[in-house]
Amino acid sequence: MKKLLHTLLLFAVGLFAACQAPTSGGDVYLNDFLDDLTAQTDAGPAIRAALSHCARIRAARLILPGGELRIRPDLAVEKYQFISNNDEGLKRIAFDLVGLQDFTIEGADTKLLFTGFVSPFNLERCRNITIRNLSIDFTRTFHSEGTVRAAGNGWLDLEFPDKYRCDLTDGCLRFLDDEGRVYPYSSLLEFDTQRCEPAFHVDDYWLPAHTIPAERRPNGWIRIFRSDLKAAIGNTMVFGAARRLNPGITVSDSQGIAILDVKLHHCGGMGVIAQRSRDIGIERMEVVPAPGKKRMISITADATHFSNCGGQIRLIDCTFENQKDDASNIHGLYMPVDTIFDRERIWVRWGHSGHCLLYTSPSPRDPKTSR
């Protein structure tokens, strides 16, 4: 009798737990993993926990809470990435989706506000994923902007708003955020402040040393020096980000991706970069400067970029404005050249781990694999 009662009790406990657990294919609410403090300081750990839970129960949707979520890189997912036409390196990622299928991130008009060097979204080996109804911005942009206040032979005086904090180190200009992170730059480009577009017939000033000689004037303006510098008074000088470190949405080895009603106000690389993927639809996406923040630039590279992709690529009713490069690029095979043997033969290689080439030794019974 005791054994029977024990068995029935275990069954009842198991049944109760099963009833309480989310069912496969259901909705998961990020609010269940958040509290008021983490939402306003760093929602990153809650996002990691929620996505892990979604993968475990095969949830259909992760529903964000609306309002504003602040996200930092400190406790974000960390992985080394090779991303086409962006800089490789160790990345911190907020929403890291790996191997998910038939899954939607429902933004519910949530404003994702990032601080520091963090990539908002990464999709790897996914199928039938939708990201919708959210906006992305950063507390400090990866580029910097200053207003031209005076000009002379080989110099410009620039006034920087407080949001583009700067100082001088070894006689050269350096940009930082409020926490001391350095934001390197590698180019200057003049913009017409009134028309919000590159000034007429301006030159690109490339800075191989990723800096420029400068001094602080008594009135607080910064004077920069270069022999060929020129710009119109009142225009905006944009200091372009030196590297493409943190794209907005990265898609790799995936299929059936939909990006709907997403507003991308800033990121430190391309907006949407897809590689080795197929069937990608982007609808009503806006890559535009953040309203009310008086920025000239939206994002620091292409709005969208597709490399080694197949199937259908659809861009429908999108707005791409003031990004620092193309609205879209769609490439075919894209691999670095390793060796040029002669005018008719080259050796190319994949820049990504996991790709193999099978070749056969002189003995057909002894195949070998080379990575």
Predicted segments — roles?
Residues 102-111, 127-138, 255-266, 278-291, ...:
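Right-handed parallel beta-helix
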